[in-house]
Regions:
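Short catalytic helix/loop segments, enriched in acidic residues and glycine
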Residues: 21-34
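A short, conserved acidic/glycine-rich loop-to-beta-strand motif
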Residues: 125-135
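Conserved beta-strand termini and adjacent loop/short-helix elements that scaffold enzyme active sites
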Residues: 55, 77-79, 132, 156, ...
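Short, high-confidence coil segments that cap the C-terminus of an alpha-helix
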Residues: 47, 99, 126-127, 204-205
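A conserved hydrophobic helix/loop-capping motif in glycosyltransferases and polysaccharide synthases
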Residues: 5-9, 27-28
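Catalytic-core segments of class I nucleotidyltransferases/pyrophosphorylases
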Residues: 103, 110, 116-123, 137, ...
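Conserved N-terminal catalytic core of the sugar/cofactor nucleotidyltransferase
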Residues: 2-6, 14, 32-106, 115-117
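Short acidic-glycine loop/turn motifs at beta-strand connectors
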Residues: 146-152
Length: 238
């Protein structure tokens, strides 16, 4: 079984002006919830078990997706109050288990990553965290990372400010052993990017990244949400 945790518990406040009364992953794109497009892609890549970490208006997600989506098993963990991306990971990891790696996905990001290639790279280097990276062309929009030629993450925040740098694409192949020493527990509110990654880096956990050139879009801002309706690939949406 190949499992993925989808971080879908955010409030989506930046998108509220154009998508009201819906959790962000349920925002309609080409007549269907964005979450369906996300699940379709990763099912195509071989994922057959999803855990959705949900919070704001979670009933709408659970009622729509259910416990089985196109043959993939769907489970849920519910954030009774917003826990942040790190808190969602801690909660979801309990459901999946601590003995084998799994995929971690941002619920508002579509990034066409080759899962087989991501896993192979992680296995070769025995990573705790394997990041999927993309080339950010918008200066100042995405925080770049300093990466060695071998893929080792030397810094979580790049000192380079111009476009064309490698940035975090919000898709990770992750081994839950990495959580044992970081100092956060299930139920804690924390950020994956600011808290958990920072702690993992300080502990010298194996953090590496590999670049992918597949389609990338983050629907967190109204401008990009409108763009998604035109650009999200359709080959996995039927």
């Amino acid at each position: 079984m190949t499992s993925a945790l989808v971080l879908a518990g955010g409030l989506g406040t930046r998108l509220r002006s154009v998508v009201s009364k819906l959790p962000k992953p349920m925002a309609p794109v080409r007549g269907r919830p964005f979450l369906e497009h996300l699940l379709d892609y990763w099912i195509h890549q071989g994922v057959n078990h999803f855990v959705l970490s949900v919070g704001y208006l979670h009933e709408l997600i659970i009622d729509h997706i259910g416990s089985n989506y196109k043959g993939a098993m769907i489970e849920y963990v519910i954030e009774e109050s917003p826990l942040g991306t790190g808190g969602g990971l801690l909660l979801g990891a309990q459901k999946i288990g601590h003995d084998k790696p799994f995929l971690v996905l941002n619920g508002d990001t579509y990034f066409a990553v080759n899962l087989e290639k991501l896993i192979a790279f992680s296995n070769i280097h025995n990573t705790d965290w394997c990041f999927s990276l993309f080339t950010a062309t918008e200066a100042g929009r995405y925080m770049g990372m300093d990466i060695s030629t071998q893929g080792v993450i030397n810094s979580l925040k790049s000192t380079t400010v111009q476009g064309g740098r490698l940035a975090n694409g919000g898709v990770y192949w992750f081994h839950p052993r990495a959580l044992h020493q970081i100092g956060f527990l299930p139920g804690d509110k924390c950020s994956l990017e600011e808290d958990i990654f920072t702690a993992a880096f300080a502990l010298r956990q194996c953090m590496m990244g590999i670049e992918f050139s597949g389609f990338f879009i983050d629907i967190g801002l109204p401008m990009d949400y409108h763009l998604a309706s035109k650009l999200v690939p359709s080959e996995f949406t039927s």
